[in-house]
Curated annotation (Swiss-Prot):
It is a multi-pass membrane protein. It catalyses: UDP-N-acetyl-alpha-D-muramoyl-L-alanyl-gamma-D-glutamyl-meso-2,6-diaminopimeloyl-D-alanyl-D-alanine + di-trans,octa-cis-undecaprenyl phosphate = di-trans,octa-cis-undecaprenyl diphospho-N-acetyl-alpha-D-muramoyl-L-alanyl-D-glutamyl-meso-2,6-diaminopimeloyl-D-alanyl-D-alanine + UMP. This is Phospho-N-acetylmuramoyl-pentapeptide-transferase. One of its GO terms (molecular function) is UDP-N-acetylmuramoyl-L-alanyl-D-glutamyl-meso-2,6-diaminopimelyl-D-alanyl-D-alanine:undecaprenyl-phosphate transferase activity. It comes from Syntrophotalea carbinolica (strain DSM 2380 / NBRC 103641 / GraBd1) (Pelobacter carbinolicus). Belongs to the glycosyltransferase 4 family. MraY subfamily. GO terms for biological process: cell division; cell wall organization; peptidoglycan biosynthetic process; regulation of cell shape. Its cofactor is Mg(2+).
Amino acid sequence: MLYHLLYPLHEQFSVLYIFRYITFRAIYATITALMIAFILGPWLIDKLSRLQIGQSIRKDGPQSHFKKEGTPTMGGTLILLAIVLPTLLWTDLTNVYVWVTLLVTVGFGAVGFVDDYRKVKLRNSAGLSARQKMLWLMLIAGTAGVMLYSYPPFQTTLAFPFFKGLRPELGLFYIPFAVLVIVGASNAVNLTDGLDGLAIGPTIIASGTYLLFAYLAGNARLAEYLQISSVQGAGELAVLCGAMVGAGLGFLWFNTYPAQVFMGDVGSLSLGGALGTIAVITKQEIVLVIVGGIFVVEALSVIVQVSSFKLLGKRIFRMAPIHHHFELKGWAEPKIIVRFWIISIILALVALSTLKLR
C-alpha cells in the first residue's frame, strides 16, 4: 500500500525513491510486524484470558505440562495480524506471488482457528478430525498450486541443491508436489509446537533464510551468478519473509519459557504453510528439508513411532514428537528448546552454503 502511494511520487520527492528497494521495505516490514506484536500482544493475551480461551493438555503427556493447563492459546492470531498487515503495507500488491502466499497463510490460519476454537469449546485437545483438517489444507494448497501452474512466468522444474544440472521438469505433476511441500511443512511445524518457543524459534530462522533466498531468486543477475533458478517477482517475498521474522520475534517475547500464550494451530499451520509456499515459489523446495530440519525430524519421529507400534508392537521413543522423548529422559524444557534452536541455526547455515556448493 505504501509502495503504491509513495513510490509514484519519487520524481517530485527524490527521497521516496527508496521505496523501490526491496531491502528497505523488508527491513521496515520486519520492524512494523515487531511493533504490531509488541503493541497488540498484551491486549490479546488479556482478552484471551478473559474469554477463558485456554490450552487443554493431553492427559498422557509429560506431567510437567499439566501446570500449563489454561494458558491462553490461539495466540497465532497475533502472528497472522503481524504478518498480513505489514505485507499489505510494504509489498508491491500487484505481485501474484505475494497474494498466493497470503492465500495459503490466511487460509491455513483459518483452518487452525476453527480447530483451536473447537478444542476450547469442547474442552479437549482433539479439535477438527485429522481427515477434516487434511482435506481443507489440501484444498487450499491445491488452489495455490493451480494458481502458480497457471501463471506463465512460473517454472515447474525442480531444483536440487549441490547438483546444478539436475532440474527435472514436473509439468502438471508440479501441482501435487506443491501440495505435498506446503501441507507437509504446515503439519511439521504444527507437530513441533509442543514446548514454549520451540516452534517459533526455528520458524524465525527459516524465515530469515528464505528472505535471502527470495531476494536472490528475484534478482536475475545474482541468480545467474549463483546458478540458482531465477524467479521474476520472487524478490517481493523477501518483504513478506521480513514480516514473518518480525512477527515471530514479537510473538516469542510472550511465548518464551514460561509462556504467557501459545500460538495454537492458527499460528503453526499458517506459519508452516507460508514457509512451504515460499519454498515452492523460490524453487528451494528441497532445501526446505535442510532449513526446516527440526520440523522434519519432529514429523519423522511421529511417523516412526506410529509405524513401529503398528508393525512391531514396540515404541522407538518414550513419546513422540521427539521433544517429548527428551523431556521424559529428564532434560529441562529450556535446554531442549535452546538446543533445538542451535541445531536450527546450523542447518540454516548449511542450507545457505548450497548457494555456492553446486
